[in-house]
Amino acid sequence: MTMKKKILSTAVLAAMGIGSAHAVYQSPDGLGEVLLVPYYTVQDGNETIFAIVNTTDYPQAVTVRFRQAYTSRQVLDFNLYLSPHDVWTAKVQDDGNGGAEVVTGDKSCTAPAITTAIPFRNFEFTGSKVDNGPTDQSRVREGYIEILDMATGPFQDDSNPPAVWDANDDG
């Protein structure tokens, strides 16, 4: 019995002596490659308004991914292309059919294109992917948003062609 206590005590002390694991690294300038918006909701008449800002002097491409709160399954994703210092704004609102949708009047380029609104989808939790949760659109009414940096300029030749990246430029 004494031997077991010594081994357990040694194991606990060894575990305490190990430094903490650093799974997340924050750069000194506070900028990163992943942004998590911890909660969106359209429950009880609420809307969630958010903005994505390119703070750099270069064009930037990001993936925007919406996940429902029940099991974190994806309900919508798209790519967003921002010109230097561009701001993209949108909101998540009730879609009038028991679900939710993203609405924007912003002219920044998205793929697929979002001209005004795009509804959240239930393909990740219906059909062959059904789980123990609800399968109707009520499930997409709250969740969280992942914003992932795919690429930031400059181009290899250090150019910045606005015709490719600046959807807000009328010229």
Task: Please place each PLM-identified region on the residue numbering.
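Gly/Pro-rich, tryptophan- and cysteine-flecked surface segments typical
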Residues: K4-K6, V12-L13, G19-G171
